[in-house]
């Protein structure tokens, strides 16, 4: 996502290297590069023109800041204007003073509207808001069944009257059912079409008039580029929407939709879909996306993902096990699964500042390594996972694990060596000391005469089973120790 745009923008900063300050002459080339980058990302031409004009005015009017080079100053100006372009701040979902809150979902066929409805329902559940989904798409085969299946997956009820009922009547009765059940929010999944047609728009307008939604959200496909912005504008003019949900933002998209929707339609992006899983829906934060576009990472979203995936009680238990040197392979596999719940490895790494330069090949290699590790740990017995030292001292156990996991004995030995080193390092960091120099750590595996130093103990090369006896100091001739 946005990789090509980020790389092109980086070329723009390079144009200002070695300059003392921003001037009309030296900024010209950088602005041309930014312009080319945005157009290549399929940002609307009028949006690009306005953006470049605003950046130029701010850059030429900026005061010289001591200790900040022109390139850094220019990046900050571009960042501020990107945030401004996309809407400055997150616009939350509406919430009616008196329940139920009614959210009308609209969009063309193939944009992921029905899935987005379920994703939004799950998001509301996580916010402790009860939801009811209403299936009014009576035209597309299996649309009602799809919503019911998704509802079962996320444990959210679905209201429908079958495929022969009138969509407007289904929507009306769905809202009444929500009132009867005391549900907080109603999500009405309307029919999509392959194109905008008068019949669809008239039906949507009638549903809107009857249910009087608090939010009318248009689901658009990010991969359609600036066309998504034009579609949002058309829907807003004819129906009156309050925001958009941008789907497939994790795909091979150039970013034009995210940068054009607010400016062209005047309506905010409220959520973005970042994957196929039903959990893969995030509130849209313009500042965070601007950071990612400029290769600054997105630490806040990463922290939020971690908070969702990881239980605080589990973290405390894990911390205690690290400090007590009882961290084992069961804990290690649990950590790996926590990470999987947070999303793909590539997606997580790109949220970390400075990790954007990792190639897709590097990420793929890392994902394969994680799978190999999980396969080897899965081939261990319960006793071996609880006591990794058993494997270090037993070649026969390592051979059995290698055969069971489909990997070599060398791979298993390497896993155990790296695990032992990692466990020691984690304990040292947890206790606030430095590797190899912590009081009372001599008996820890791998410590020896420094971090993983000393001669290998029983088992295999590279592993040290215990601290061993301290080496005797040789007497020096002459003055000895002064």
UniProtKB/Swiss-Prot annotation:
Pfam families per the UniProt record, alphabetical: SRP54, SRP54_N, SRP_SPB
Gene3D superfamilies in the cross-refs: P-loop containing nucleotide triphosphate hydrolases, Signal recognition particle SRP54, nucleotide-binding domain, Signal recognition particle, SRP54 subunit, M-domain
Binding site for GTP: 107-114, 189-193, 247-250
SUPFAM superfamilies in alphabetical order: P-loop containing nucleoside triphosphate hydrolases (SSF52540), Signal peptide-binding domain (SSF47446)
Entries under InterPro entries matching the protein: AAA+_ATPase (IPR003593), P-loop_NTPase (IPR027417), Signal_recog_part_SRP54_M_sf (IPR036891), Signal_recog_particl_SRP54_hlx (IPR013822), Signal_recog_particle_SRP54_M (IPR004125), SRP (IPR004780), SRP54 (IPR022941), SRP54_GTPase_dom (IPR000897)
Top-level taxon in the UniProt lineage: Bacteria
Basic residues: compositionally biased ranges: 469-482
Catalytic activity annotation: GTP + H2O = GDP + phosphate + H(+)
RNA-binding listed as a keyword: yes
EC class: hydrolase
Cellular compartments per GO CC: signal recognition particle
Region (Disordered): 380-413, 452-482
Subcellular location: Cytoplasm
HAMAP family (alphabetical): SRP54 (MF_00306)
Free-text comment on this protein's domains from its UniProt entry: Composed of three domains: the N-terminal N domain, which is responsible for interactions with the ribosome, the central G domain, which binds GTP, and the C-terminal M domain, which binds the RNA and the signal sequence of the RNC.
Function, as annotated: Involved in targeting and insertion of nascent membrane proteins into the cytoplasmic membrane. Binds to the hydrophobic signal sequence of the ribosome-nascent chain (RNC) as it emerges from the ribosomes. The SRP-RNC complex is then targeted to the cytoplasmic membrane where it interacts with the SRP receptor FtsY.
UniProt name for this protein: Signal recognition particle protein
Organismal lineage: Bacteria, Bacillati, Cyanobacteriota, Cyanophyceae, Synechococcales
